[in-house]
Amino acid sequence: MERPVWFRWLRVYAIGFGIIGAGVLLFKYTTPTDEELIAALSPELRQQYERERKLRQAEQQELMRIVKQTAASETPVWNTGPIKSPWERKGVSAESREQFQQVKAEQVQREELQRIREELETIRQQSANKTQEIASKKSWWPW
């Protein structure tokens, strides 16, 4: 028996709603919140995130100030003003970012070298103590 056309359309809409609803529910319950994501980070990354939070907030405030200033002016929208265009890769911002990354990498290397030096010094001290202990127990003559 042939079903009426409205029944077919009702079925199409019901199935479509079910698929979209399932997708929304999956997204809602499987996507972690910001707090859960930060809590899942390793301690080093969490520390770095906390250190750089104020820097990101300051950047955002500066960007909002520039946007308000640009919106209040009579210049055309495509004139970016103090904001550098993302297509201009030869600008100062790319160089400063590279320099910042280089300085940060050097700092991490220095800290790692300092840690290795301290660890090596403790190993040397332990080895010297152990050698001294063995030497004090043994003598040159077996009798």
From Swiss-Prot:
Pfam families, A to Z: CBP4
Region (Disordered): 124-143
Compartment annotation: Mitochondrion inner membrane
TM ranges: 5-27
Lineage: Eukaryota, Fungi, Dikarya, Ascomycota, Saccharomycotina
Gene transcribed to yield this protein: CBP4
Name of the protein in question: Assembly factor CBP4
Stated role: Essential for the assembly of ubiquinol-cytochrome c reductase. It has a direct effect on the correct occurrence of the Rieske protein, core 4, core 5 and apocytochrome b.
UniProt family annotation: Belongs to the CBP4 family.
